[in-house]
Amino acid sequence: AAAVGAVGLIENSHTRVIDASTAHRTAPGWVYGFPELYKDPAQTIGTARFIANPGCHATGFLAAAAPLAALNVLPRDYPLTCFSLTGYSGGGKKMIAEYEAGDKGNELYSPRIYGTTLKHKHLAEMQKISGLEAPPVFCPVVDDYYRGMATTIQLHNRYLRGQPTARELSLILAAYYAKQPLVSVAPYSDQPAYLAANALAGTDRLELTVSGHEGQTIVTARFDNLGKGASGAAVQNMNLMLGFEETRGLVL
């Protein structure tokens, strides 16, 4: 409500806005600020007046799912599920204080599932920007570390168009992001036994890892919820809007 009110106070036609709240992410007249999802981000983002900065969980989900939907590999009616692990900084000042209190409860030392009503505030943008007919069944989890995210979608390959293997899906995503300075796809042959959610903490990059076999695939996006999942994306969008180098001021 505050963001809507603030934008309403603008009385001229040349002020440009990047809104980091949820208020305008699916609103008419606003451009969704995920440059890598556009064929010409310098044009789409660079000329926009109103940019809605993506949500952190939505960033990971869309990085994995949106290209596959756009390329017609992922059917629009596919019943997607998504699991997303975040550090506690994603919960804002109140949650940070809870986790950093000296007398915090024992439950705060373990991962905690939330959003169990399946009405998370990022679902609307997840569905709209991916172009899916329904939002994913989304399970967010917060854990006892400060920053970093790992967002994963799960796929049954036989329901995808062309029935690609996990290796082929990795190549498809790698080709899609080949020229992007801030989003990359790990080589399929480089599959660690563990994927640490805080591996990219302190950076503004996002890395996709595709794992699985002929029948099933998981695609995991790892990034910093405070970087590519928040302020890093805002700076990237600002750079494009001002005609600067896209990565200016960002940590690669």
Q: Can you name each region flagged by the protein language model?
A:
Residues 67-71, 156, 240-244:
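Active-site catalytic microenvironments for nucleophilic, acid-base chemistry
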Residues 63, 67, 125-129, 233, ...:
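Alpha-helical scaffold segments in soluble metabolic enzymes
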Residues 79, 83, 88-219:
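C-terminal substrate-binding/catalytic lobe of Rossmann-fold NAD(P)-dependent oxidoreductases
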Residues 19-22, 184-189, 249-252:
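A generic structural motif
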Residues 178, 197-252:
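C-terminal helical cap and adjacent loop that interface with cofactors, partners, or active-site loops
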Residues 1-114, 211-213, 248:
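N-terminal Rossmann-like NAD(P) cofactor-binding subdomain of oxidoreductases
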